[in-house]
Amino acid sequence: MFVPEEIIETIKMIEYQNLDIRTTTLGINLKDCADKDLDLLKENIYDKITSLGGNLVETANKVSQKYGIPIVNKRISVTPIGLIMGSTVKGLSDEEAVDACVEVGITLDKIAKEVGVDFIGGYSALVQKRATYEEKMLIRSIPKLMTKTDKVCASVNVATTKAGINMYAVKKMGEIVKETSEITKDAIGCAKIVVFCNAPEDNPFMAGAFHGPGEGDAVINAGVSGPGVVRAVVEQLKGKDIGTVSDEIKKTAFKITRMGELVGKEVANELGVNFGIVDLSLAPTPAIGDSIANILEAVGLERCGTHGTTAALAMLNDAVKKGGAMASSNVGGLSGAFIPVSEDAGMIEAVEVGALRLEKLEAMTCVCSVGLDMIAVPGKTPASTLSAIMADEMAIGMINKKTTAVRIIPVPGKDVGDYVEYGGLLGTAPIMPVSEFSSEELIERGGRIPAPIQSLTN
């Protein structure tokens, strides 16, 4: 039950502080679509997704209008394609298997455009320990896929706390990202590729969303975003102690989460599917004031990236989770604070003045979601360095038993001081410096970094 005061407060949040439902994501199980015949596989996928998701956009718009709450994105996530390609590629040559994977990806892109969603996720492989033949071929196909599709997002889980880090997969993903950067305009394909440690099965956010093997047949997951609301609250607390700031953020997260769950459940009910989770992640946009960096600066930092940034971010992340957990029993996904550089106006400014560097971002990922996100680096950066950056981030996730990820973009022809413009939610990325010292020998070793002792929890 919402009292009139809460409704008025929510209206103000929407009107003045950029509060919105960032996404309603329909997860769809495709395991029953598997077939040894490629044409039948594609037909099964088409029929399944369009039958369950054909009304997603219309329904989300209807619910948005009913409550007066913007739903910015409507998305679909599917069972990791690497799990359903086995019988289809059996007996094919490597080249034929890669092409078969790409054809499935093109089918997903066609469906996404037909039903009107913003993105479709799940062109994915779960290879934290080892990779099957079909998963190897799917990973190999990612660069080619990115030249032929617009709305398909790819993700590869290369590490978990239980399994350790698959360094063969880390090495390969550095090469895949490098190749993709060289064959897509301004390396835009890399913005749709995520490398994960401990990937959640119910994440509604792109580019890393997929419908996990442990999920049901169809489910709605909602992602709420309110950096502008949190910033406005913190700015009213000048001179207050940090515990008070934390308490007020918790209260705000509680309100935001209730709204997200209400809308998510309504969309699920209208579609006749289960409601899954509400993701508590504070996801920024390039809009002024809708920035995680600005929240941290309102807490008391001259610039995001200076000393104290990691501590302030830890407090913010914890407060958001505590407030959300009190509001709902259906919390999941990533649920933290995103720090994507290109998508956050405050982060961009911090990079420009030299307050924020890649090393500090890596430290910040120890306490937040989701990792090194939308980081643009010089196009000359070698694949081995990209892999090493991924390995560092995977280690943080593995040891800390949390989700971490890397979405890094080596932009051809660009160097430190340059920018690449993507527009929309992807924003503008300043090219950040990386170490020029080589990590190639480490990456060439391959193998698997063993799981830490924390994995023995049974």
Swiss-Prot record:
Q: Where is the signal peptide?
A: none
Origin superkingdom: Archaea
Q: Which InterPro entries match?
A: UPF0210
Pfam families per record: DUF711 (PF05167)
Q: What family is this? A: Belongs to the UPF0210 family.
Q: State the protein's name.
A: UPF0210 protein MMP1427
Q: Which species is listed as the source? A: Methanococcus maripaludis (strain DSM 14266 / JCM 13030 / NBRC 101832 / S2 / LL)
